């Protein structure tokens, strides 16, 4: 499973010229240079903040210095300080960009109503403001008003069809509504508009996989992996897609990469263990699944897989203990009941095996392996 989050608009630092008061011309000209240096740093560091602060001291009417300082403090995580500077900027000049920036800070502070008020004030003056519409959509989503948020973003897309962030957020919302075709279309558009946007490529791959478009999923996820070679999520997703395509060596390579990058990643360990079982590499599967079991000892799936690997190597006592642990933890795990049935069958306990196969089929009528096993022991 993955979680998707809406992205708020990125507000750029200002480098535009300023009106220089005649009585302080030299000081304000120096302030302009300080602001330019701050923009060049642009990392929210103490050094950047200090430059804007000095610029304000020299030229108190330089609105860009207040605004940029607010954004720098926002990047530092100093939201109260950021709010204060952005409000000072608005006092000097009631600008749409300043209010959008303030709304973003208020949202990060958890002041949803205050943030919404700022976006709405911008839209009253300029109904075509795409950043304000994007921000309003984020708030509507937080208020569980997803259909309204979608309509808001569709309006933004009509105003500016070149904004990749609008389409990315549309994809996230359509996905939340389980409109997977629409989500895939929105993510695809976002990628077309900005081929460097990792999240759009990654989520496009996830949607294509969910829709069964495995080759399209492969292409999108491979493109995402090229953008962020060390991102664990994309390699996990690639491993799943490769496995569905029957490309087990590539799936194994992806999972091993995740296990190497993040040894405590449970999903990678258990999926690698299952793949090793399919490849009949039972000893390594057992070692891998033991690692997974140490990470999540209450997960029935890992105990079922571990029991199956031990069963294939003839470690009957350990296999039975682990398979019974699996059904104890999750009595609805059809695979665990089937695997336990296979073990009991091999131990000559046909009646008990028959009962486990029947339970597996009752839980999952489409589990063909359990049906075939039941036919072998006799219904």
Which role does the model predict for each range below?
Residues 27-31, 63-64, 96-98, 130-131, ...:
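Helix-start (N-cap) detector for alpha-helical repeat units in TPR-like alpha-solenoids
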Residues 29-32, 278, 342-379:
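Terminal, low-structured helical/coil segments at or just beyond the last alpha-helical repeat
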Residues 1-9:
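Bacterial N-terminal signal peptides that target proteins for export
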Residues 20-68, 74-77, 84, 379:
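N-terminal leader/linker segments that initiate helical-solenoid repeat arrays
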Residues 41-54, 75-88, 109-121, 143-155, ...:
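Structural signature of tandem alpha-helical TPR/SEL1-like repeats
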Residues 58, 91-92, 125, 159, ...:
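Structural marker of alpha-solenoid helical repeat scaffolds
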